[in-house]
Amino acid sequence: MFLIEADYALKYVDTDYTMPIADLGITDADLANQYQYTKDIVTDSKGVLKGVSWQGCPGVLIYSRDVAKEVLGSDDPAEVQKAVADWDTFTATAETMKKAGYFMTSSANDTYRVYSNNVSGKWVQDGKIVVDDNIMKWVEDSKKMVDAKETNTYDLWSDDWSKGFYPDGKVFCYFGPAWFVDFSMAADTDGSIANAGKWGATEGPQGFFWGGTWVCAAQGTDNASLVKDIILKMTTDTDIMTDIVKDDNDFVNNVPAMEAMAADTSYSSKVLGGQNPLAM
């Protein structure tokens, strides 16, 4: 067995290297509680499921509570959402942030995945490249914000891009899923916004997902029964998946588990200032 990441899934799914999940004896009923998009990503061109994930990676807008209180008058997620409810409102709020001395995002690249997850069709159709209207809106909105110095053009994961994880970076928001919040925003580093529990989360202009890891069975494996057992335990056992949420603050690929955790008033995120963001 081996693991694949979302951006590289098709490289392996549409090959003979990956074994059909059904050939392991795993049924549609076994996977009934999983989010459909996690299946779609690892379904090959013939409609065959080739991998299973324990993760769901829906993304949210992650904002600085201190900046929200200073500029918007409130750090309540519902109030902040009003200022970022759609892209036109988002870009208008960027002007307000700039006047107050803050960048709306660290980079124009922060919003790309949100726009690109909301296109109406594939990049290549009938052998021709098709640029979706939502991609062009990202280009137009981003150029406007960069020209107005409301954001920058840093590469994701670069040192300059990461400066916004700290108060001196003067960045209002990032976009990301659960893994981004706890594992990528310097939560373990003294002085970071995450370490102080001063980020908040709200839906943002559009829903999106980012990343995820899938378990695949290698074609020809002589450990098929073991691979089946690992996949079923890791991706379908509600108790195990609930423990993953509680222990790691991850978002798991199990609808009943996530619905229960979203309604659990005892669950909260330290990084997000005690907020339970799972109902979004």
Regions flagged by a language model, labelled:
Residues 4, 63, 176, 222, ...:
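A conserved hydrophobic position in a structured secondary element of the catalytic/binding core
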Residues 6-11, 57-60, 67-68, 110-113, ...:
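Solvent-exposed loop/turn segments at secondary-structure junctions
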Residues 25-30, 40-111, 123-156, 219-225:
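Helix-loop-helix "hinge/cap" segment bordering the ligand-binding cleft or interdomain interface
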Residues 1-4, 17-19, 167-176:
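Alpha-to-beta junction loops
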Residues 12-16, 117, 243-246:
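Short, solvent-exposed loop/turn and secondary-structure capping segments
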Residues 4-60, 88-91, 194-203, 269-270:
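Hinge/lid segment of periplasmic solute-binding proteins
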